């Protein structure tokens, strides 16, 4: 069975421990897709100079944030890795263009979502880093090379946010106004249109040239997982948005292909 492709807007790390509309949305996602034999995650929180693939048998849970409650730092997501799958992914990308790494594990872009989707942590998970040195077109080509994994029971996932401006979020948290600003609404709508029409060129052009792009993403790390999942999808795949809405200026939109 061919697996779908999924992008998730992960939002605040607190979604990992709070019962809210976003965590309930994450929990519901697993019911929309067949159970995968493994998961390949592209998280906006592993942004590197080079292309790396986790090659650990037992990846650690990384708490890559600060200033949050102790309860959040206590969360563990003990899913196994899969070294053989990591090697297979490296071959698909190109062994001359990628490396296995044992220096990373599961960052919060991964485990804050997966602990709701698959709480037993019994599905192997591999993380793929986002290479900061690549052009948008090169990211697209790399992501396309991952598509055969779908026919091998692997769920390809991206985790970021359609809009992600931490400075603006912090500013907004000091005010009583929870409504998303116009630039966030406009960029979210542009992404929705590009993925619905399967217009990859328009999607690539959205950063940094789209409406409100520099406000939506001062840096591209949380935007690129959207591109990876769009590229791994097939033009014949149905496109759905199982989670929509805003947490202040963060778009929490999720995108399911297939």
Positions of PLM-derived features:
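Flexible, glycine/proline-enriched loop segments at strand-loop-helix junctions
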Residues: 72-80, 102, 129-136, 213
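A short aromatic-anchored loop/beta-hairpin motif
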Residues: 1-97
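Short, histidine-centered active-site or binding-site loop motifs used for metal coordination
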Residues: 9-12, 129-132, 207
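Short, basic/glycine-rich phosphate-binding loops at helix/coil junctions
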Residues: 6-7, 64-69, 118-126, 205
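Internal, conserved structured core segments that host functional sites
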Residues: 86-140, 145
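Short glycine-enriched loops at secondary-structure junctions
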Residues: 44-48, 58-59, 106-114, 162-163
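Beta-strand elements within well-structured catalytic alpha/beta cores of enzymes
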Residues: 4-8, 38-43, 128, 149-162, ...
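Surface-exposed, charge/polar-rich loops and edge strands
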Residues: 91, 124, 132-134, 140, ...
């Amino acid at each position: 069975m061919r697996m779908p492709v999924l992008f998730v807007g992960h939002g605040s790390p607190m979604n990992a421990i709070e019962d809210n509309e976003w965590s309930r949305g994450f929990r519901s996602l697993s019911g929309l897709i067949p159970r995968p034999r493994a998961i390949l995650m592209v998280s906006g929180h592993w942004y590197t100079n080079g292309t790396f693939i986790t090659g650990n048998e037992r990846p650690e849970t990384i708490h890559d944030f600060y200033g949050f409650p102790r309860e959040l730092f206590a969360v563990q997501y003990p899913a196994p890795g899969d070294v053989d799958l990591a090697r297979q992914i490296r071959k698909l990308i190109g062994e001359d263009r990628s490396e296995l790494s044992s220096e990373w594990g599961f960052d919060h872009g991964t485990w804050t979502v997966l602990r709701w989707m698959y709480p037993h942590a019994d599905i192997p998970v591999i993380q793929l880093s986002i290479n900061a040195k690549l052009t948008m077109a090169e990211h697209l080509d790399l992501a396309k090379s991952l598509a055969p994994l779908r026919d091998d029971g692997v769920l390809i996932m991206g985790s970021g946010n359609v809009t992600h401006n931490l400075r603006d979020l912090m500013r907004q948290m000091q005010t009583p106004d929870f409504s998303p600003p116009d630039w966030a609404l406009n960029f979210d709508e542009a992404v929705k249109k590009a993925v619905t029409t399967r217009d990859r060129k328009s999607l690539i052009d959205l950063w940094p040239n789209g409406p409100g792009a520099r406000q939506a993403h001062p840096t591209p790390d949380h935007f690129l997982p959207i591109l990876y999942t769009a590229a791994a999808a097939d033009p014949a795949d149905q496109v759905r948005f199982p989670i929509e809405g805003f947490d202040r200026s963060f778009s929490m939109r999720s995108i399911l292909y297939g």
